[in-house]
Amino acid sequence: MKQYLDLCQRIIDEGVWIENQRTNKRCLTVINADLVYDVRNNQFPIITTRKSFWKAAIAELLGYIRGYDNAADFRALGTKSWDANANENEAWLKNPARKGLDDMGRVYGVQGRHWKTHDGTELDQLGKIVANLSKGIDDRGEILTFHNPGEFNLGCLRPCMHTHTFSLLGDTLYLTSYQRSCDVPLGLNFNQIQVFTLLALMAQITGNKPGLAYHKIVNAHIYEDQIELMRDVQLKRKPYPSPKLEINPDIKSLKDLETWVTLDDFNVTGYQHHDAIKYPFSV
């Protein structure tokens, strides 16, 4: 929690005003932020200085794992996080590649599970990684990436957290996640939970122990209409201790995650938090 608050304060103190062309808003921006999450000791990095809706973050992660490309499928899992980008993004609404209501296009999990190759076949990046790690294999290229510039025009949004690299030392699994851009008051809350949970799940289904998760952000920013709430409300609050994430031990394979796992298979214990803060969202 401290590293999150330190980053927010750093943006307030050192950030440079940048005009964002996509949203037509100004952002206070810093370059490079490194966060570390202790998955090994189950120090769940949920925000405590405001109420965090952790279930929506995990639901979104499950949708990525399953390769979903439709906001309705994400809603069925328990999150509305893709409704706006699928249905209110002006550029996407005009894009001939859009198939209709709730269509997201070839974003995130679609790339992770159905990457199109030069010969017209598909590559399941996540499936390959799980297969290797389950055998104790780390080829130094256990990389899951959603960043496919050749298909950016086929999706409603470029991936923000775009690449996850898994590393195996003995029977301990580590994760390094890379993010090109982060709306810190809103997006980082989701991203922290997802990085932590992704490592915990991957360790569990491959029979390894979770180690540390490293989260590297390039462009970290706070939008101009979020500054006052962050500076005068959230940063004035005292954080609570980190809670714990409980995952159903019966989840043992990628197929389990693809088929029967729901939000009921996750629980957060010991979560104390301050009141919710409604930050503006920029589409």
Swiss-Prot record:
Key word Cytoplasm present: yes
Pathway per the UniProt entry: Pyrimidine metabolism; dTTP biosynthesis
Name listed for the protein in its UniProt record: Thymidylate synthase
NCBIfam families cross-referenced by the UniProt entry: PRK01827.1-4, thym_sym
Active-site residues, Swiss-Prot/TrEMBL: C160
Residues that coordinate or bind dUMP: R22, R180, S181, C182, D183, N191, H221, I222, Y223
Pfam families tied to this protein: Thymidylat_synt
Domain of life: Bacteria
GO biological process: dTMP biosynthetic process; dTTP biosynthetic process; methylation
Enzyme class: transferase
EC number: 2.1.1.45
Amino acids binding (6R)-5,10-methylene-5,6,7,8-tetrahydrofolate: D183, S282
Any one GO cellular component localisation term in the record: cytosol
Protein family (similarity comment): Belongs to the thymidylate synthase family. Bacterial-type ThyA subfamily.
Species annotation: Tolumonas auensis (strain DSM 9187 / NBRC 110442 / TA 4)
Function text: Catalyzes the reductive methylation of 2'-deoxyuridine-5'-monophosphate (dUMP) to 2'-deoxythymidine-5'-monophosphate (dTMP) while utilizing 5,10-methylenetetrahydrofolate (mTHF) as the methyl donor and reductant in the reaction, yielding dihydrofolate (DHF) as a by-product. This enzymatic reaction provides an intracellular de novo source of dTMP, an essential precursor for DNA biosynthesis.
Record-linked PANTHER family: THYMIDYLATE SYNTHASE, THYMIDYLATE SYNTHASE 1
SUBUNIT field: Homodimer.
Record Gene3D superfamilies: Thymidylate synthase/dCMP hydroxymethylase domain
Keywords, in A-Z order: Cytoplasm, Methyltransferase, Nucleotide biosynthesis, Transferase
Catalytic activity of the protein: dUMP + (6R)-5,10-methylene-5,6,7,8-tetrahydrofolate = 7,8-dihydrofolate + dTMP
Localization terms from the record: Cytoplasm
GO MF annotations, alphabetized: thymidylate synthase activity
